[in-house]
Amino acid sequence: FGLVGQGVDEDEWFDRASAFAGGEYARGIFLGDEITPADKDALAEHLSAFIGLPKDYLLVRNNRVELEDFRRDLLASRGLVCGRLDQRFTETSLLPSQRASFYFACEDPANHALESCWYVAFRDFLRGDLGYEGPEEYRLSVWGEIGIGWNWVHDEPGFDETTVAAPNLAYDIAVALRRSPTTKLCILGGRYDTATPWWNVRHTMSQLYLPDALKRQITWHRYGCGHMAYTDEPTLHAMAADLHEFYRE
């Protein structure tokens, strides 16, 4: 959006931001209100330089910004909100009276831009190629009615009483790799995905303390796309080549 990183390669900028997030920013946040005023001010200045929100905005929030606040406020002066599945997409802001947090979280410009295309293409495939005649209305997603009540409880391997609402499958991956050390794992992701951010995946995997032999079984590919790599044509070609190479190995 022309707010930060001008003149710097996007991958290089992403790497710089990731290093900041795992270093200076993490240390500052860990200190809580014990951080010195000078360090808090410097942290806000550096964070602003990376994410584009004003320094004063960050200081008021103690340098902590929720995703939905970021999406809502980054381009507020232009009357726009950012996407969640792909931050490159924008659309005009909701009215100030539309304050429901869950509603806004589901209002994703990236999804709105792509879903109608999927809907038309999928309906055409069902009827034209498969000869399927179904209900006139085919709903691509009913998350707000069904998914929100899904039972996410998961027993994490090696833990007692782990019936938590937000399951962590990283331990399952670690167990699978340790039990089958010849298994290969390919992890793909996009820079503009804030639904399942690339940095979060790297950080989670780093907490498994896998031996080097198992780490070498993991292949990483980061692309210039959002959550749905197949909607970005350059990424689609790159991902196909990377997956063909992975399967050959």
Which residues fall in each region the model found?
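Alpha/beta-hydrolase
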Residues: F1-N111
